[in-house]
Amino acid sequence: MKLSMAILLVMALIIFTLDKNYSSPKDLPSCEKGIHRKVTCKQCNKRSDNDDDYTKCCKSFDAFITCGFLLSKES
């Protein structure tokens, strides 16, 4: 019983560490490297007719998330 609990604890720690290290949303590529981000930012820019929004979306993760959220509400 103690051995199985120890194994489960170790597995949980490994999964938590991997999840934290590899699924950070701030690791998303910028517009130059990521097609999904580029398309989302272009759609957001078309809706606002402000070129500054495209630049903000490409450079700032928070602006990208906000843009994606606003686009999903319109659908």
UniProtKB/Swiss-Prot annotation:
UniProt subcellular location: Secreted
Protein origin, superkingdom: Eukaryota
MF term (GO), any: potassium channel regulator activity
Range of residues in the leader sequence: 1-23
Keyword Thylakoid: no
Function description: Inhibits voltage-gated potassium channels.
Name of the protein described by the UniProt record: Kappa-scoloptoxin(03)-Ssm1d
Taxonomic lineage from the root: Eukaryota, Metazoa, Ecdysozoa, Arthropoda, Myriapoda
